[in-house]
């Protein structure tokens, strides 16, 4: 059976891995998943990630913990295949009053809501991380 929403699957694997105190989680790789991991790493939500494999690329995400507690409190999908959510630059949400980040897919690539606001761009709200 094919996967209906690969990004929601990615977020679920990360959430489940952290709740189970796993060191890392693996998943099928794609350009969008790698771009999301770059944002998560830059914001300090994951330790590292690595994509490997030619025939079936695999993405391994190394999870991050602070004093034994998971760093990611909530990670949720906003825009989904059945209901895409697009926002203009002025309408970009602030997650938890600016403490979390919204991951936004813009014409210049995947970035945080802060970076998109500074660049004066809107886009599709992929998800929230806090």
Curated annotation (Swiss-Prot):
Gene3D superfamilies (alphabetical): 3.30.1370.30, 3.30.1490.10
Record's protein name: Small ribosomal subunit protein uS8
Record-linked PROSITE patterns: RIBOSOMAL_S8 (PS00053)
HAMAP family documented for this protein: Ribosomal_uS8_B (MF_01302_B)
One of the protein's GO biological processes: translation
GO CC term (a single one): ribosome
Gene name tied to this protein: rpsH
InterPro entries xrefs: Ribosomal_uS8, Ribosomal_uS8_CS, Ribosomal_uS8_sf
């Amino acid at each position: 059976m094919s996967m209906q929403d690969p990004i929601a699957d990615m977020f679920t694997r990360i959430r489940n891995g952290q709740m189970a105190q796993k060191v890392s989680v693996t998943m099928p790789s794609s350009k969008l998943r790698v771009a999301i991991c770059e944002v998560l790493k830059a914001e300090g939500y994951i330790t590292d990630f690595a994509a490997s494999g030619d025939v079936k690329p695999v993405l391994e995400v190394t999870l991050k913990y602070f004093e034994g507690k998971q760093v990611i409190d909530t990670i949720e999908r906003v825009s989904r295949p059945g209901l895409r959510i697009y926002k203009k630059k002025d309408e970009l949400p602030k997650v938890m009053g600016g403490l979390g980040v919204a991951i936004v897919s813009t014409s210049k690539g995947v970035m945080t809501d802060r970076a998109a606001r500074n660049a004066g761009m809107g886009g599709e709200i992929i998800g929230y991380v806090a």
